[in-house]
Swiss-Prot record:
Source organism of this protein record: Homo sapiens
Job of this protein: Required for both DNA replication and mitosis. DNA replication licensing factor, required for pre-replication complex assembly. Cooperates with CDC6 and the origin recognition complex (ORC) during G1 phase of the cell cycle to promote the loading of the mini-chromosome maintenance (MCM) complex onto DNA to generate pre-replication complexes (pre-RC). Required also for mitosis by promoting stable kinetochore-microtubule attachments. Potential oncogene.
Family label: Belongs to the Cdt1 family.
Keyword Nucleus: yes
Gene3D superfamilies associated with the record: DNA replication factor Cdt1, C-terminal WH domain (1.10.10.1420)
Record-given protein name: DNA replication factor Cdt1
Phosphothreonine found at: T29
Single Gene Ontology MF annotation: chromatin binding
Primary residence: nucleus
Region (Disordered): 1-118, 143-165, 383-415
Positions with biased composition (Low complexity): 28-45
Length: 546
């Protein structure tokens, strides 16, 4: 069935006898100046578009076109929107279709003139509408240009930002990213300081409520754990600048710290909250309501600090502006809140300057209560003798190793039979040793402590080499074995320093060999250990007398 329909379709499309199209008045696009007349399609053409044959010779007058074209003069075409000629028609817009009825064959001429008048009036109305639209477009362009010119001076009047290093964007534009309506927003660094005050007040309140002295070391550790941010004394100084009536700061000693690195005799910065006395005379407590009240006071003082900078900014404008502070609800649009300078930290109490001993005379004056009266007398005579020069040109003589003999004194019964000279020499050496201990530097004291441990470490090191059955060991292995075998608790790094000192004092017994990136220790196991121990003891006594 479908195949037959397709066959019928193609059969109908075949060219047949010539068909004459009935005359009709179709609305077409305006034809050229001299349009050709439509004629019946050729019988030989199979195309849908039919050519227009020339007019039949038997006709006396050509058939009029279906639509007439409006012809304008040269002056009218060049200026179609001139306001001085409102009656001149213009070409209609492409989107509008103007229907014109053409006179058919045998139509009276007065009907044709009436239709032409209607077409002209339509074109005039279209022209008037186009003029109105053009005037509106020109007015909008002029208003937009005026608005752009008015915005230019504001942009030129803004101060240029410095070319130096800028803060991160989340700090410079922190005020713009706050939710809600714009108001008296604090800068980012001021909000961080307010958070530090809240954390500090919380830690101080906990310590104060349980009758524990709040120190800066305790508060610093707690605030850094809460904020995950560094908290230094300069931040405490800024808090004191903003809210001076919040705490009382003092430098105190003998404060228990429960910390290994701090001694009780050291001065520490204590922080005491200033609270109002209770009505019943009880000790004031830093409760949650007081914490909230102090936090609000601190935030209000920060806002007042920013208002001062805002007031100075308003005074620098041209013309200057004056806004009452109680009526201020938001900052000036050109006031950069996040560029407000930091708060200057206030001075905190510092520990008193302790007296430092720099000369032996000061050490002796300080240590008079540590020595016996006879030794004090001998040292004073020695100081007088050394102070008086033997000759004007000769330099001062060095301190003799043995002080001069003192007048004989009654010896106790336990020292009967002992030479007085021997006793004097012993006492002189003891005084010299005490003097060396009082004037010894920390590095030398640490070296002496290591020298005292060396005899025991030498025995342990020889046992390690004997058990390992190797002529040489790496420094890491030797230190690890020594740490596990020694009775004194030391780290591998400290043990390595002892081995270096041992190789420095006894290079013929213990030698170090650096191979590439490792250091190897080689020990002479055939050497006499007693002789090695005696040499170390002698070296220790020699350095103790210095």
């Amino acid at each position: 069935m479908e195949q037959r329909r397709v066959t019928d379709f193609f059969a109908r499309r075949r060219p047949g006898p010539p068909r004459i199209a009935p005359p009709k008045l179709a609305c077409r696009t305006p034809s050229p100046a001299r349009p050709a007349l439509r004629a019946p399609a050729s019988a030989t053409s199979g195309s849908r578009k039919r050519a227009r044959p020339p007019a039949a010779p038997g006709r006396d007058q050509a058939r009029p076109p279906a639509r007439r074209r409006l012809r304008l003069s040269v002056d009218e075409v060049s200026s179609p929107s001139t306001p001085e000629a409102p009656d001149i028609p213009a070409c209609p817009s492409p989107g509008q279709k103007i229907k014109k009825s053409t006179p058919a064959a045998g139509q009276p001429p007065h009907l044709t003139s009436a239709q032409d008048q209607d077409t002209i009036s339509e074109l005039a109305s279209c022209l008037q509408r186009a003029r109105e639209l053009g005037a509106r477009v020109r007015a909008l362009k002029a208003s937009a240009q005026d608005a752009g010119e008015s915005c230019t001076p504001e942009a030129e009047g803004r101060p240029e930002e410095p070319c130096g290093e800028k803060a991160p964007a989340y700090q410079r534009f922190h005020a713009l990213a706050q939710p809600g309506l714009p108001g008296l927003v604090l800068p980012y660094k001021y909000q961080v300081l307010a958070e530090m005050f809240r954390s500090m007040d919380t830690i101080v309140g906990m310590l104060h409520n349980r009758s524990e002295t709040p120190t800066f070391a305790k508060v610093q550790r707690g605030v850094q754990d809460m904020m995950r941010r560094r908290f230094e004394e300069c931040n405490v100084g800024q808090i004191k600048t903003v809210y001076p009536a919040s705490y009382r700061f003092r430098q105190e000693r003998s404060v228990p710290t429960f910390k290994d690195g701090t001694r009780r005799s050291d001065y520490q910065l204590t922080i005491e909250p200033l609270l109002e006395q209770e009505a019943d005379g009880a000790a004031p407590q830093l409760t949650a309501s007081r914490l909230l009240q102090r936090r609000q006071i601190f935030s209000q003082k920060l806002v007042e600090h920013v208002k001062e900078h805002h007031k100075a900014f308003l005074a620098s404008l041209s013309p200057a502006m004056v806004v009452p502070e109680d009526q201020l609800t938001r900052w000036h649009p050109r006031f950069n809140v996040d560029e407000v300078p930091d708060i200057e930290p206030a001075a905190l109490p510092q520990p008193p300057a302790t007296e430092k001993l720099t000369t032996a005379q000061e050490v002796l004056a300080r240590a008079r209560n540590l020595i016996s009266p006879r030794m004090e007398k001998a040292l004073s005579q020695l100081a007088l003798r050394s102070a008086a020069p033997s000759s004007p040109g000769s330099p001062r003589p060095a301190l003799p190793a043995t002080p001069p003999a003192t007048p004989p004194a009654a010896s106790p019964s336990a020292l009967k039979g002992v030479s007085q000279d021997l006793l004097e020499r012993i006492r002189a050496k003891e005084a010299q040793k005490q003097l060396a201990q009082m004037t010894r530097c920390p590095e030398q004291e640490q070296r002496l402590q290591r020298l005292e441990r060396l005899p025991e470490l030498a025995r342990v090191l020889r046992s390690v080499f004997v058990s390992e059955r190797k002529p040489a060991l790496s420094m890491e292995v030797a230190c690890a074995r020594m740490v596990g075998s020694c009775c004194t608790i030391m780290s591998p790094g400290e043990m390595e320093k002892h081995l270096l000192l041992l190789s420095e004092l006894l290079p013929d017994w213990l030698s170090l060999h650096r191979i590439r990136t490792d250091t190897y220790v080689k020990l002479d196991k055939a050497a006499d250990l007693a002789h090695i121990t005696a040499r170390l003891a002698h070296q220790t006594r020699a350095e103790e007398g210095l």
